Amino acid sequence: LEKAYPGRGEELAKKAKELTLAVYKKCADYALERGIIIADTKLEFGLDEDGNVVLADEVLTPDSSRFWPVAGYEVGRSQPSYDKQFVRDWLKANPDSDYKLPDDVIAGTIEKYKDAYKLLTGEAFRDTGI
């Protein structure tokens, strides 16, 4: 950051870190109360036209985070998840797939995302058909 923003790199990195930890803590606490552990996530930041650090891109989705169910969580073992790990595991087990996912893997991934949605919102996901 120092190369990209001479004189501001350290300040911007500190601000991004503070924002990352604040967003993660608030969301992790919210999710934990609803039965989900947010194991990790990625957040992306940018600068607005006034040079302020702003949160950008997707935030805490199953594509950018690992969501584990609290029920059954055990330290030191692979965890079931409500995220794209399901797809990664299938691809790892099927290296000759040419990255074409079978319908059951796609459907399973959709169900995992819907399960996470329901736990986090308390409502069933309504498919709009879009």
Please provide the spans of the model-predicted regions.
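Anionic ligand-binding catalytic core segments
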Residues: 1-12, 60-120, 125, 130
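A long amphipathic alpha-helix within ATP-dependent nucleotide-binding catalytic cores
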Residues: 7-39
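Conserved metal-phosphate-binding beta-hairpin within the catalytic cores
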Residues: 38-59
